[in-house]
Amino acid sequence: MHTSDPSNTATDHQQQTLELSIELMRRDSVTPHDKGCQEVLVERLSPLGFVHEFMYFGDEQASGRDAQVKNLWARRGNQDPVVCFAGHTDVVPTGNPDNWRIAPFDAKVHDGYLWGRGAADMKTGIAAFTVATERFVKNHPDHNGSIAMLITSDEEGPSINGTVKVIEVLEARNEKITYCLVGEPSSTDSLGDVIKNGRRGSLGGILTVTGKQGHVAYPHLAVNPIHALLPALAEFSVTEWDKGNDFFPATSMQISNINGGTGANNVIPETVEVVFNFRFSTETTEEELRAKTHEILDKHFANTEATYEIDWKLSGHPFLTAEGKLVDACKVAIKDITGTDTQLSTSGGTSDGRFIAPTGAQVVELGVRNATIHQVDERVEIDDIGKLAQIYERMLEELLLG
């Protein structure tokens, strides 16, 4: 039921969300750095009764994959259901700032848009949920259940010391999330037209084929790994892995890199390397993809002196949140605020939802339009950020009242 105070106008939501968005966006929090964004959120959440803890994972002295990551877990209440907003304060690099119409960390309003890195992905989403929570708690201080925020600064990077580690801590102490709203920019043509109720899995591999180096004029004295690879690669690239289902397209395999050769035109190389990636549906498991890949390669390498090995990396399993209370809350809120009948989708890349869904939580991604994410001149419509805060507030009403 809709119980918001009539004074909760779109203008109020918009101004408050805009101000907080700008405060967050002016901090150049390129992965894995948070640059104080999480402290800003704590300052807003603590007066509402949130209890917070910062969780640090990784090496404080390291950089790259092993760098220390700061994470925030903040919660109000200790009862079920737990409605959690999951997001990230880190952003991707800007590239050459001279190519931007407005400097990427100036966070300025122009032509009806808020411009800057993190505008769409995803500091406005964090700001919108914070404002929605402030208004919801003010109007309903004795609401059912709990509200939580899980914020990391390691979503755009390796994603090894961020959400996945926080979830491990929560699981170890049996602290469960019931409904998880991931604030990734899910919308396509208009706010709320698409929500993600699942994501494909991602399985990558580096295939290295080893032969014997030699002179191209004496191939009988060498083993050409490229020649050994080609027949296997031909079959590998056209294999149908599954047909998909009602929620997911068919599993796809794409080759992104092939590296071989010494640079000389008269040398048979010793090795060739192929980088590939599966985006897979719930119709196929990681184990099945690995087994079928090895079956293809074993068949083709059986009659050659070349050998192969694969270095596998699983980035995430596929997940799907069927229609239920969380999806219904999204649909109702979007319809009430925008008049749009939203569409469910599992397209796109991976998100941190892949770490949360295996705990049993219902997970949905809902945020602003994604047309300019990771691009020069990233921006978001000013009108949308206020409406997003309204949508989030309506969802809290649907999930935690009555």
Swiss-Prot record:
Belongs to the peptidase M20A family. DapE subfamily. Catalyzes the hydrolysis of N-succinyl-L,L-diaminopimelic acid (SDAP), forming succinate and LL-2,6-diaminopimelate (DAP), an intermediate involved in the bacterial biosynthesis of lysine and meso-diaminopimelic acid, an essential component of bacterial cell walls. NCBIfam families: dapE_proteo, PRK13009.1. This is Succinyl-diaminopimelate desuccinylase. The active site is at residues 90, 155. HAMAP family: DapE. One of its GO terms (molecular function) is zinc ion binding. Zn(2+) 2 binds at residues 121, 156, 374. It holds the Pfam family Peptidase_M20. GO terms for biological process: diaminopimelate biosynthetic process; L-arginine biosynthetic process; lysine biosynthetic process via diaminopimelate. Zn(2+) 1 binds at residues 88, 121, 184. Its cofactor is Zn(2+); Co(2+). It comes from the Bacteria. Keywords: Amino-acid biosynthesis, Cobalt, Diaminopimelate biosynthesis, Hydrolase, Lysine biosynthesis, Metal-binding, Zinc. It catalyses: N-succinyl-(2S,6S)-2,6-diaminopimelate + H2O = (2S,6S)-2,6-diaminopimelate + succinate. Its EC number is 3.5.1.18. Homodimer. It comes from Psychrobacter sp. (strain PRwf-1). Pathway: Amino-acid biosynthesis; L-lysine biosynthesis via DAP pathway; LL-2,6-diaminopimelate from (S)-tetrahydrodipicolinate (succinylase route): step 3/3. Gene3D superfamilies: Zn peptidases. Binds 2 Zn(2+) or Co(2+) ions per subunit. It is an enzyme of class 3 (hydrolase).
